[in-house]
Amino acid sequence: MAAYGRILKTVTEASDEILQIAYVRGLCIGTAAAIASAFDFVVAKADAPFYVTSAELGGHSAEAGAWCFKGDQDASLGYIRSLLDFIPDTTVDHETSDDLNRLLTELPLSADIRASLTAIVDDGALIEVYADYGTPIVTAFASVGGIKCGVVAGNYTEDHGRITRDAAYKTAEFLDICDSFGLPVVTLVNSDGLAADIPMDAVRSLFCLCTTRCPRRDRHSRSCHRCRLYITRFQEPR
């Protein structure tokens, strides 16, 4: 147990300083799963058991948003390589043939927001994290004008973009990672506010939007109601 404690302490101390990606390719349960969950990203092989406590006891990882991607071995390793392409200190900004000031003739804002994001970012390339968790919000890494950035977007096709508990925690976690590694964040707001059953601790987690130090740009793309409007306004002009 002391060794487990030392490992977890080392992982925690490295947080915000070193990019940490855990790849779960086999059985990972109990304390090992807890340590993996402390990494910045967890990528899991589709058939790999991954939980702190068993599903029968309510500890199934699918309910906790424990991984940012799950697929077969080739897809998982490809996803990890793509992540490394977007995190500073593991990559550099690159030249793009897409003009930053190009005219976007049509953005399908009423459709899945991913279509709009593909039109906005360089070369239509982005890598989504936690795609199956907190689905009213889309979080992804991309490049705009050759500059690597994080993207947070309301997905209006999922309950009119109303922010749920999972979506709030997902947003807070993603923004913390962007802030840690100095990635600017582009926010596309398209939300009818908060879900009726969202707990207060999840609402509080959203106020990380107010405390992030990384550059941010917010764009109200369609709908911006109530608390969501206030949160996006709590930032210093840049």
Positions of PLM-derived features:
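Ligand-binding clefts of soluble mixed alpha/beta catalytic domains
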Residues: 1-238
